[in-house]
C-alpha cells in the first residue's frame, strides 16, 4: 500500500499511525485490537489483507469514518524479480539525496518543498526506495551517483567542481555545502530555456546521510562519482574535435580530449604535449591533502578543481559515512583514455592507475574499486585499419587496486526497421521477439558485422567482422565480452603481434556498471541514446519513431504476453555462459 485517500483527499501518511497487514496465513492479530478487545476477541484475519489506522482524527472528516481508497502495488514476474542492483539518479540535485524534508523559504511564511513532492514519506528519496524495495524484492545493491561539473572539452582547460542551481536560495532543514564550498562561493550551473540546465551537486551532508540510510535498509552501496558537462550552447570555446569556435552544448564527458583532438591535423596526440594536457585535467591533489572531522571533509592541497580532487574528495566523504561496499573511480572517459603521449603509451590510464592506488590506501581492503568504461572503450584500440592494436586499459584492469572490470554496457541489440523488406524480418516477426534479442546480445552489430558508413546503415549493407591475420575476431568485437575476458591480449604493430599485455584471462569479474534500454520505439536499436532538447547529444534510436514502448524495456503481465522483459531475459542467458559477470542489473 503506497498512497491512501480519505473522501477523495490524499492523506499525509507521515502524520498518521498506519499498519498494513498483508493477508498471509501466519499474520498475528493487530496489537491495538488485541489491547482493546482482548486476545480471545481479536481475529487475525489470516488470508485477508487489511489496514489499521490508529487514532485517526475523525473530526477532520465530520466525526465519521471516511471513505478510503488505496493504491496497491505488487511485483510481477519478470524484470522486477531479476533486478539485484540499480543506479540511483539523478546525481545532480542539491537536496535530492536528503532523507529528511528541506524547504525553500521565500519570506513572510512562504515555503516550497525542495525534496518532498509526495505524502508517503518524509523525503522523495525515501519514498522512492520504499517503492523500489517493495517492487524489487531481490534488490541487493545501489550505485549512488553524485555529480560534479566539467566546463571544457579541452583536457588542459577543463575544471571539475561542485555547482549550485542558484547563488541566492534560503533553505530550512539543511544548508547546501560541498567540498568546502557554500552556496555563495560555488559556481552556478548555466541556464537553458530560462531555467537551470542541471540540478546542483548534492550537498555533502545529504550524501553521507543517504549512504547511512541505504545501509540501514540492508543494501550494499557503491558510490559513483560522475562528471556532467556544463557547457552552455552560447559558449565560444574552441572545439578540440573540429577547431571551430563554440563547443557542442552540454556534451558527453567521453568527448573530453587533448587539443587538437586525435585525428585532426596538428593533433598533439602521441606527443608530450598530450601528456601535459592530461596531467592538467587530473591535477595534483593528493590523498594527504584531505581530512575528515565531524562528518565533513576538508582540503588543504593545491588550489585546483581537478578530477583527482573530485574523486579523492568522495573517497574521504564515504569514510565519514562509515564506508561503502564499492567505489567507481571514473566512467566513460574514452576521449582521454585513448590519447597517447607516444606510440602505445596512454597517460590517462597511468593517471587512473595512480588514482586507484591512492583510493585503495584511503578506502582500505574491504571496498571494491572499479573503473566504469564505455562499452566502446574497455577493449582494443584499433588504428590504421587494424594494423595497430593496443589494449589501453589493460594496465588498469590488471592493477592490484582494481577489483573488477566495469563496463557501461549500451551496445545496439537490434536493427529493426519499419516495413516488410528489412533484413531482420528473416530472424523475427517482432522487435520484441525473445530469441531474436537473445541472439543479438552476443551477435549482430558490433559482433558479427558492422556498418562502415551511414549510407551502409540505411541500406543494411553489413561488413563482416573478421580477423584474417590471427583468427581472433573478438579483438574487433565490442560485444564479445566473453572472448575479450577469457583470452590473452597480444598487441599488434604493423599488422604483427608483439607483446602480451598484463591482463590475465578470467582474472577479474566484469561489472555491468550501467545497462538499460529506453522505453521507446525500437529502443534496442540504440540503448545508448536519449532525448535531451538542450544537449548536442540528444537523439532517439536509429529508425525509431519516438513513440513510447514499455514492452521493449520492462515486463508486461504474463496474461498479455507469455514472454516477459524481452531485452533483459535475453541478456541473462548470455551472461551465464561463463563466470565472468558479477550481476549488477
Task: Identify the residue ranges that each predicted region occupies.
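Structured segments of extracytoplasmic/periplasmic soluble domains
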Residues: 7, 89, 131-135, 145, ...
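Noncatalytic carbohydrate-binding groove/subsite architecture in carbohydrate-active enzymes
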Residues: 279, 283-531
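Short linear interaction motifs
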Residues: 1, 109-137, 190-207, 308-309, ...
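Well-ordered, non-membrane alpha-helical segments in soluble/globular domains
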Residues: 118-129, 200-208, 304-313, 346-357, ...
Amino acid at each position: 500500500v503506497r498512497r491512501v485517500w480519505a473522501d477523495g483527499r490524499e492523506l499525509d501518511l507521515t502524520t498518521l499511525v498506519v499498519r498494513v497487514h498483508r493477508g498471509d496465513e501466519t499474520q498475528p492479530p493487530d496489537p491495538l485490537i488485541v489491547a482493546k478487545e482482548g486476545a480471545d476477541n481479536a481475529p487475525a484475519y489470516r488470508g485477508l489483507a487489511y489496514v489499521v489506522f490508529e487514532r485517526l482524527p475523525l473530526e477532520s472528516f465530520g466525526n465519521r469514518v471516511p471513505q478510503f481508497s488505496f493504491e496497491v502495488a505488487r511485483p510481477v514476474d519478470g524484470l522486477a524479480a531479476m533486478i539485484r542492483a540499480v543506479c540511483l539518479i539523478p546525481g545532480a540535485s542539491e537536496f535530492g539525496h536528503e532523507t529528511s524534508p528541506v524547504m525553500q523559504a521565500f519570506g513572510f511564511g512562504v515555503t516550497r518543498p525542495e525534496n518532498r513532492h509526495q505524502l508517503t514519506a518524509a523525503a522523495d528519496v525515501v519514498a522512492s526506495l520504499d517503492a523500489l524495495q517493495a517492487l524489487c524484492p531481490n534488490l541487493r545493491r545501489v550505485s549512488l551517483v553524485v555529480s560534479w561539473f566539467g566546463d571544457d572539452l579541452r583536457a588542459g582547460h577543463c575544471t571539475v567542481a561542485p555547482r549550485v542551481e542558484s547563488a541566492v536560495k534560503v533553505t530550512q532543514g539543511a544548508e547546501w555545502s560541498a567540498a568546502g564550498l557554500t552556496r555563495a562561493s560555488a559556481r552556478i550551473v548555466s541556464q537553458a530555456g530560462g531555467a537551470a540546465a542541471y540540478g546542483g551537486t548534492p550537498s555533502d551532508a545529504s550524501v553521507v546521510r543517504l549512504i547511512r540510510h541505504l545501509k540501514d535498509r540492508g543494501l550494499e552501496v557503491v558510490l559513483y562519482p560522475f562528471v556532467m558537462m556544463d557547457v552552455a550552447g552560447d559558449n565560444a570555446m574552441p572545439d578540440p574535435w573540429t577547431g571551430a569556435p563554440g563547443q557542442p552544448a552540454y556534451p558527453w564527458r567521453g568527448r573530453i580530449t587533448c587539443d587538437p583532438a586525435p585525428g585532426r591535423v596538428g593533433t598533439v596526440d602521441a606527443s608530450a604535449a598530450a601528456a601535459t594536457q592530461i596531467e592538467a585535467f587530473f591535477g595534483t591533489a593528493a590523498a594527504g591533502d584531505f581530512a575528515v572531522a565531524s562528518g565533513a571533509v576538508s582540503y588543504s592541497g593545491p588550489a585546483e578543481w581537478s578530477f583527482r580532487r573530485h574523486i579523492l574528495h568522495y573517497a574521504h566523504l564515504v569514510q565519514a559515512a562509515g564506508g561503502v561496499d564499492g567505489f567507481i573511480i571514473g566512467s566513460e572517459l574514452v576521449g582521454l583514455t585513448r590519447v597517447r603521449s607516444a606510440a602505445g603509451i596512454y597517460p590517462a590510464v597511468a593517471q587512473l592507475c595512480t588514482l586507484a592506488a591512492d583510493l585503495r590506501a584511503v578506502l582500505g581492503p574491504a571496498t571494491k574499486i572499479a573503473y566504469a568504461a564505455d562499452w566502446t572503450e574497455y577493449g582494443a584500440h584499433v588504428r590504421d585499419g587494424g594494423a595497430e592494436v593496443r589494449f589501453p586499459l589493460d594496465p588498469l584492469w590488471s592493477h592490484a587496486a582494481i577489483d573488477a572490470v566495469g563496463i557501461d554496457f549500451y551496445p545496439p541489440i537490434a536493427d529493426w526497421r519499419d516495413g516488410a523488406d528489412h533484413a531482420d524480418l528473416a530472424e523475427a516477426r517482432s522487435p520484441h521477439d525473445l530469441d531474436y534479442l537473445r541472439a543479438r546480445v552476443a551477435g549482430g552489430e558490433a559482433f558479427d558485422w558492422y556498418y562502415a558508413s551511414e549510407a551502409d546503415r540505411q541500406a543494411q549493407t553489413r561488413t563482416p567482422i573478421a580477423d584474417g591475420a590471427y583468427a581472433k575476431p573478438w579483438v574487433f568485437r565490442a560485444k564479445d565480452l566473453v572472448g575479450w575476458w577469457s583470452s590473452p591480449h597480444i598487441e599488434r604493430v604493423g599488422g604483427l603481434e608483439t607483446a602480451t599485455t598484463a591482463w590475465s584471462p578470467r582474472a577479474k569479474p566484469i561489472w555491468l556498471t550501467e545497462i538499460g534500454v529506453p522505453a521507446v520505439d525500437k529502443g534496442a536499436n540504440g540503448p545508448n541514446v536519449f532525448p535531451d532538447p538542450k544537449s548536442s547529444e540528444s537523439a532517439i534510436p536509429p529508425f525509431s519513431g519516438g513513440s513510447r514502448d514499455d514492452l521493449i524495456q520492462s515486463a508486461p503481465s504474463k496474461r498479455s504476453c507469455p514472454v516477459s522483459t524481452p531485452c533483459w531475459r535475453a541478456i541473462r542467458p548470455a551472461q551465464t555462459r561463463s563466470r565472468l559477470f558479477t550481476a549488477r542489473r
